[in-house]
């Protein structure tokens, strides 16, 4: 029996192993990017809630009235970037808002509207993440 030529077997085995390896590696990078974005959004929502507590809720509690706070609790981009600098990578800008009608609990929502996942395997399920913090009063 004649022995077959073994040239190129290593390259073929590398191709079989490299494709799943690189897909897994980029999926891990993409999920890590999503996780740090979600953590930064939670941090930004918490900072907005603290700003509401200090600037609006404290005055309403002293005057014994219902707080009437709406809009962006951290109106400048510099204040938001100081709290969560990762959200500004790639030219993205997060939004932070409070509903116009005050109900208990007061909810502060931070979102990243133009965020998209790099890997197409996720679809659109993880695009435009948002996080919120509720303040009971």
Label the model's feature ranges.
Residues 38, 46-137:
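Short, conserved structural patches
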Residues 10, 25-55:
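Aliphatic-rich helix starts adjacent to a transmembrane/signal segment
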Residues 7-20:
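N-terminal signal-anchor/signal peptide hydrophobic helix marking the start
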Residues 22-24, 29, 111-112, 119:
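Preference for short coil/turn "hinge" residues that link or interrupt alpha-helices
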Residues 1-7:
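N-terminal leader/signal peptides at the extreme start of proteins
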